[in-house]
Amino acid sequence: MINADDELLPETSEILKNECKKIDADIYYGNCYWVDSERNLEYVSKPKHDLSKLLYNMVLIHPSTFVKKKAYEECGLFDVTYKYCMDKELLYRMYKAGKKFDYIDRCLTKFKAGGVSDTHSKAVFKEGSRMALSYGESQIKVKSIEIIKTVRNQMVNMIKETRVYRVLKGI
């Protein structure tokens, strides 16, 4: 599920080939290097492993997620009515269908920060809410989670504007 400005690490193909020989899964996922616009390393991102939370959170790192063709054939392709959450929706659909996920504790890709999902958080929240409702979640629960995420996002943005944050980021 790699995007145009993301990149596979040179050893990723070999790692995946070996993992496929060891473990028969439908979806393989791993860690990722997050890089800035100049391709400088910002941090290593590891997925959260509670796949049941996929309905509300992207717990996997989509550029470091690899899906076998058979899983697409059995579960379908991306739902293009989603602009921001199509990868999360597809992975949730595969999870609900009982597809087997396998975690590889290695960095498999470089992910460029600052993409569309990062810069359109309100639209992402709205689309995520639509997705949750389409899977039968209650309106009250969906709206509550949307409010919590919005407040959390606003707090993070406020922290990023402080002098202390800028000093610590420069270290």
What are these regions (language model features)?
Residues W34, L108-T109, E146:
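Conserved beta-strand edge residues that scaffold enzyme active sites
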